[in-house]
From Swiss-Prot:
It comes from Mus musculus (Mouse). GO terms for biological process: cilium assembly; positive regulation of smoothened signaling pathway. Glycans are attached at residues 171, 178, 190, 277. Its main location: membrane. This is Thioredoxin domain-containing protein 15. Pfam families: Thioredoxin.
Length: 344
């Protein structure tokens, strides 16, 4: 009797799955073809199908504010596969052409994977590259270059010189200061007129070669003043203005030195260029070095004079050598006498 009861229970248990399969076949919806199982996210475990459906509904509600902030969709697909190959297949043909930039330049940001798949909104990195473009990529306009060139050509002079009135003057010559004259007496400390001053020595061959060219400058620039002084006679002025070698040419505005001529080629043309670059005053045309400039007022030949400073230096050196020699001989005579006294 007990065996018969257990047998009926076993048949009833085995009959339930069979009865369910027949009902499913009659309705035309097999269990295995009812609907595909949704893709499981990494790290998520679902125990029942109701939990899966509920989870997808929660994700849809959470995605609605994000989609509203990013803008309208450019593609009906919401989530792409995280596999790069699957994401590239869903992209529009524009991304594969490399011409997504409006300027017609290839933008490397067009070929990146976007995990959100919202092409209408665009990636965050693409926006950053749009707002912060690399410097130097955009070519400068030709108009800006032309403006820069015109600005360089119209530069203001470094020294703003007040040109003197030359009305009624016909003879423009160089003035040479003697030993008793002071340079500051010929410069106006309260004015803005410019004067070119030459420090020279008559026994220097470089000063002599410069003399004809410097003598012709007053005719080329009649509105400027030109002075020359012997550096050996005005040693205090030479030290004051840093004259360590001659010839030395300084441009003064009033009583203030403004520029120094540092070229080794000291000719009339280089002096004209120097004055024009510093003051903006153009030289008169057809001014050349003449035979009169060779004669003076600045001498163009070496003047042979006695250098008394050199004579005094030689006399002092010879006297010191003679005194040292005499003292050395007397010391030699004293040393043997001292040795004899110690021996006794």
């Amino acid at each position: 009797m007990q065996l018969l009861c257990w047998w009926q229970v076993l048949l009833w248990v085995l009959g339930l799955p069979a009865h369910g399969l027949e009902v499913a076949e009659d309705s035309g919806h097999p269990w295995r073809e009812e609907r595909p199982v949704p893709a499981l996210q990494v790290g998520a475990v679902y125990l029942h199908e109701e939990e899966v459906a509920q989870d997808h509904r929660d994700q849809a509600r959470a995605a609605e504010p994000m989609e509203a902030s990013l803008g309208p969709r450019g593609d009906p697909m919401v989530v792409l596969s995280v596999v790069p190959g699957a994401a590239e297949d869903q992209r529009s043909p524009e991304a594969h052409d490399g011409t997504c930039s409006a300027q017609g330049e290839e933008d490397p940001s067009c070929g990146r994977e976007n995990l959100f798949g919202l092409q209408g909104a665009g990636g965050f990195q693409d926006r950053e590259e749009e707002y912060y473009a690399e410097p130097g990529v955009t070519e400068a306009e030709p108009v800006a270059t032309e403006d820069a060139n015109s600005t360089d050509s119209l530069k203001s002079p470094k020294v703003n010189c007040e040109e003197r009135n030359v009305t009624g003057l016909e003879n423009f010559t160089l003035k040479i200061l003697n030993m008793s004259q002071d340079l500051m007496d010929f410069l106006n400390p309260n004015g803005s007129d410019c004067t070119l001053v030459l420090f020279y020595t008559p026994w220097c061959r470089f000063s002599a070669s410069l003399a004809p060219h410097f003598n012709s400058l007053p005719r080329a620039f009649p509105t400027l003043g030109f002075l020359a002084l012997d550096a050996s006679q005005h040693s205090s002025l030479s030290t004051r203005f840093g004259t360590v070698a001659v010839p030395n040419i300084l441009l003064f505005q009033g009583a203030k030195p403004m520029a120094r001529f540092n070229h080794t080629d000291r000719t009339l043309e280089t002096l004209k260029i120097f004055i024009f670059n510093q003051t903006g005053i153009e030289a008169k045309k057809n001014v050349v070095v003449t035979q009169a400039d060779q004669m003076g007022p600045l001498p163009s030949t070496l003047i042979k004079t006695v250098d008394w400073l050199l004579v005094f230096s030689l006399f002092f050196l010879i006297s010191f050598i003679m005194y040292a020699t005499i003292r050395t001989e007397s010391i030699r005579w004293l040393i043997p006498g001292q040795e004899q006294e110690h021996a006794e």
